Amino acid sequence: MEEAKQKVVDFLNSKSGSKSKFYFNDFTDLFPDMKQREVKKILTALVNDEVLEYWSSGSTTMYGLKGAGKQAAAEHED
């Protein structure tokens, strides 16, 4: 699972200039051979490790690196 976690973090870092939040389906594309439930477990583990954070608009939940993006800057998060 550590290798999969690193793959997610590398993906997010490579996109940090354009986007800071991503849909769940963006991550399922990273792991085409895995079931959605397995991908969800990887993302949940990263959230629990405080590497990722959830962001919700009320109707949609997205994932991003903790402290990245305009929302974090507006809330003065580190």
UniProtKB/Swiss-Prot annotation:
Q: Which Pfam family, an example, fits this chain? A: DsrD
Q: Which InterPro entries match?
A: DsrD, WH-like_DNA-bd_sf, WH_DNA-bd_sf
Q: Give the protein's biological function.
A: May play an essential role in dissimilatory sulfite reduction.
Similarity remark: To A.fulgidus DsrD.
Protein's recorded name: Protein DsvD
